[in-house]
Each structure stands twice: as structure tokens, then as C-alpha cells.
Swiss-Prot record:
Its cofactor is heme b. SUPFAM superfamilies: a domain/subunit of cytochrome bc1 complex (Ubiquinol-cytochrome c reductase) (SSF81648), Transmembrane di-heme cytochromes (SSF81342). This is Cytochrome b. Binds 2 heme b groups non-covalently. The cytochrome bc1 complex contains 3 respiratory subunits (MT-CYB, CYC1 and UQCRFS1), 2 core proteins (UQCRC1 and UQCRC2) and probably 6 low-molecular weight proteins. It is found in: Mitochondrion inner membrane. A ubiquinone binds at residue 201. It holds the Pfam family Cytochrom_B_C. Heme 1 (or BL or b562) is low-potential and absorbs at about 562 nm, and heme 2 (or BH or b566) is high-potential and absorbs at about 566 nm.
């Protein structure tokens, strides 16, 4: 008789995704980040749910409700620290997952890649509205600055901003709707993740050499289920250590001050995982131009498959393109550093050079070097 796990309509879906999935035998630890992102999403939804049970989305009580969670709710401090630092781990895994895709040419699975970019944007939106909820100084001013960027949209900009605010400034209506969005979006992300996996399983996973691996596939379980489990243990250990020993390491001290529309903090900046995009935004001395650059810094990922010129898929055997990849990594780190610095000399020019290099790498240098490597192979 056939196994229930292979015949039951529901179990069959789980089986095809997690048990009997044919997987390339040579995928490395860089392929662990997809499942780690799934774990991040689940842990964020769970900790977020417990926080939402005690949080109030009203400007008069939001800040004190977060303090109440940390002081008076059983293990509330732990749940809050896991949730806040879980966001950082979410983005660390995201950036490493995207970097893996860029390095090994996984972006040639176009549907999977584009849904991934949409997922990235959704997670960024979720993190942004979530950062506003504690209603500290940086929450309030971050919300003010970032929502204000929409006023750069020609003709409808100002109406758009006031529509999102629900008034003429960031106020109670804004906080209430941001809480609603922050509760909703993770479930949208979970739905989009299902699509991401659906399209991935149409083609199967890529692998480090970028060749067809049909001749050498192994079942996902037990091999990769245990490999993923090891990744889970490492990440959860790191997250727990950060949440218990250094819970405020990545936060902004300004957010321990309740929001005050009358006092502007000396340096308004987002959480560390948005600093690279913030640096690109600030490097253009024009509002609309900055907003377009900010959007393009993420959407440029969508044109990567179109601009792939090499005959080889990944960078495993392409040293010149590898050099460009690591320059991109260094450039991202420089942009992250600049995003947290004040707008003054020499940071302005460093940010502008790094921003130009960022787009040049994606749009000009990588396609050019891929084309040159083809020439060298023929020669």
C-alpha cells in the first residue's frame, strides 16, 4: 500500500517540499539561508503575536506599553529583545541569501528571483512600520522623514503623504495604521514565500558549479533536513546570545526617549540594515532624484538576470567577476558606514562615490566583465 505521506492531498505537498524533494548533492552552507529565513519569519510572527497581546497602538500609551511589556509581563523583556534582534538576523540572512544568488547565478531562475525581490521589499516595509511602533524619538522622526519622501512624487506627492499620515503630521492615526500594517504584512510575506518556493520547485535548486545536477540528486530528508537543523541551532544560539547579553547593541539610544514632535534628534538615521539605502538616498542633492535612487538601489536586482552576459552561470570559475562581487560587498559595507555618519565632508563625497560604484557594478562593470570573460575563453 502507498505511504500516506505520498498520497494524502495535504501531506503530499509537505512531502514534495521537505522530504522527497530531489536536491543537488553538492549544495553548500550558502543554501541554508532560505530555510533560516523561514525560521526567522516564524519566530518573528510568534514573538510579534505575544507582543501584540500587550501593546497599545495609541500615541499616549504606546511607549509606556512597551516599557510595561519589558517590566511587568512574564518574560516580556525576552520576547521584545528576541523580536527586535530577530529583525537584525532576518536582514543578515536576507543579505547573505541575496549575495548567494548573485554569486552563483541563481537569479537565472527569473520568477523565483523576482518574487524574492518583491519579498525583500515587503520585509523592508514591514520592518519600517514596525520600527515606528515603540513611539520613541527615532521611531517618530524616522516615520516623518521616510514618509515625507513620498512628497517628491510629482503633482500628487503632498496629498499622498497626508493620506498615509491620516492627517497633517505623523500622529495617532499614523501609529494605528502602522500597527495594522505591521500585523498584516508578515502574513503577506508568508504567502509570497509559498509562491517563491512553488517557482523554485518547478526548476529545482541551483548548485555551486552552476551545471545541471539531474544526474546527482539526493532526497532532501534526511540529508538537508539535518543540515538545516544545524543552521537553525547556530542561528538561534547567536540570536539568543545577542538578545540576552547585548540586547541594545544594534538599537538607537534616541529610541529610549518618548517621541517629541518639538525636538529633532541631532542625527536621524534608520536601523543598521537600511543604512546602505539611506546613504544612496542622501548622496543625491535632490529630493525626487534621491527617492528614485533609493528605489533603484533595490529594484536594480530585477535587471540582474537581463544583464547576465557570461556563458557560465556562477562565479565559481570566473576570477575577474569574483573580484567585482567582493568589491560590491565592500561597497555595501562602506555605504552602511556612511549612512550612519553626519552629512558633512568627507562623508558626502565618499557616499557619492560609493553610490556611483554600486550602480556601475550592477549595470556596467558586471555585464562588461562577463562579456570579456567569454572572449578570453574563446581565445
Amino acid at each position: 500500500m502507498a505511504n500516506l505521506r505520498k498520497t494524502h492531498p495535504l501531506l503530499k505537498i509537505a512531502n514534495d517540499a521537505l522530504v522527497d524533494l530531489p536536491t543537488p548533492s553538492n549544495i553548500s552552507a550558502w543554501w541554508n539561508f532560505g530555510s533560516l529565513l523561514g525560521l526567522c519569519l516564524i519566530s518573528q510572527i510568534l514573538t510579534g503575536l505575544f507582543l501584540a497581546m500587550h501593546y497599545t497602538s495609541d500615541i499616549s500609551t504606546a511607549f509606556s506599553s512597551v516599557a510595561h511589556i519589558c517590566r511587568d509581563v512574564n518574560y516580556g523583556w525576552l520576547i521584545r529583545n528576541l523580536h527586535a534582534n530577530g529583525a537584525s538576523f532576518f536582514f543578515i540572512c536576507l543579505y547573505l541569501h541575496i549575495a548567494r544568488g548573485l554569486y552563483y547565478g541563481s537569479y537565472l531562475y527569473k520568477e523565483t528571483w523576482n518574487i524574492g525581490v518583491v519579498l525583500f521589499l515587503l520585509v523592508m516595509m514591514t520592518a519600517f512600520v514596525g520600527y515606528v511602533l515603540p513611539w520613541g524619538q527615532m521611531s517618530f522622526w524616522g516615520a516623518t522623514v521616510i514618509t515625507n519622501l513620498l512628497s517628491a512624487v510629482p503633482y500628487v506627492g503632498n496629498s499622498l503623504v497626508q493620506w498615509i499620515w491620516g492627517g497633517f503630521s505623523v500622529d495617532n492615526a499614523t501609529l494605528t495604521r502602522f500597527f495594522a500594517f505591521h500585523f498584516l504584512f508578515p502574513f503577506v510575506v508568508a504567502g509570497a514565500t509559498m509562491l517563491h518556493l512553488l517557482f523554485l520547485h518547478e526548476t529545482g535548486s541551483n548548485n555551486p558549479v552552476g551545471l545541471n545536477s539531474d544526474a546527482d540528486k539526493i532526497p532532501f530528508h534526511p540529508y538537508f533536513s539535518y543540515k538545516d537543523l544545524l543552521g537553525f541551532i547556530i542561528m538561534l544560539t547567536a540570536l539568543t546570545m545577542l538578545a540576552l547579553f547585548y540586547p541594545n547593541l544594534l538599537g538607537d539610544p534616541d529610541n529610549f526617549t518618548p517621541a517629541n514632535p518639538m525636538v529633532t534628534p541631532p542625527h536621524i538615521k534608520p536601523e543598521w540594515y537600511f543604512l546602505f539605502a539611506y546613504a544612496i538616498l542622501r548622496s543625491i542633492p535632490n529630493k525626487l532624484g534621491g527617492v528614485l535612487a533609493l528605489l533603484s538601489s533595490i529594484l536594480v536586482l530585477m535587471v540582474v538576470p537581463i544583464l547576465h552576459t557570461s556563458k557560465q552561470r556562477g562565479l565559481t570559475f570566473r576570477p575577474a567577476s569574483q573580484l567585482l562581487f567582493w568589491i560590491l560587498v565592500a561597497d555595501m559595507l562602506v555605504l552602511t558606514w556612511i549612512g550612519g555618519m553626519p552629512v558633512e565632508h568627507p562623508y558626502i563625497i565618499i557616499g557619492q562615490v560609493a553610490s556611483v560604484l554600486y550602480f556601475s557594478l550592477f549595470l556596467v562593470l558586471n555585464p562588461l566583465v562577463g562579456w570579456l570573460e567569454n572572449k578570453v575563453m574563446n581565445w
